[in-house]
């Protein structure tokens, strides 16, 4: 009898481990939203707390390829590609408005289509103003915010933004063409490698980003979004008001050497959410490329103390 019980316990343990492994496997799916087929990655058990991961420029959900497996044991993770990014379709500009507000509406409808009713958000770069819009529209759905170089403060804008602000005031065709350098290969490589420990960033991420941005029609779409980024800066006061009003649990983890969104942007969260956690890692803009393990631990520690009463 003891031997039978031992064998039964062993089998149950094996089944449990198999189920856990299956839940932790990365899955790749698509969902139709308006006239756009949205690609997304998913990992973890849907019965566990959900984290929606929103990528930046010029990347895709591929940027979360290392982070998601590290979190999948404790959380359900979903990471969509925005329209005209990564594997998601690029509807024609004549029939689809490429603005941050519209991208946020698409992501909003996507979350409803895949059944997300409450979720934490990991927001980065372009994904930040998209995610902050979702939070303003549906504050009751947001259980926590993890901002990784995801700015909402004027003081968080690095020097490079001065030229863009001048362009926003006077958006001529000539200036529009100048900003095509933002998605040149050498610029994308610089975004990944500047400020990171030497030899810590492989070529996979920036090579794939460059491939995606070179797809037909995407260059002009990126030009549209570079101009429309001014709408995000205009909404900074509203984003900040949301924080002051709802006081969501907030973790800011910043690559401290990022020239685009500088450390002052992380520190400023304390002004609106006094209990916000602020951490810096010795990396650049794409901090996950070199510090995904450290960032995963910060996220686990943070959510362990915030989600137990929020979901």
What would you call each of these model-derived segments?
Residues 23-38, 43-46, 50, 78, ...:
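Flexible "cap/lid" subdomain of the alpha/beta-hydrolase fold that forms the substrate-access gate
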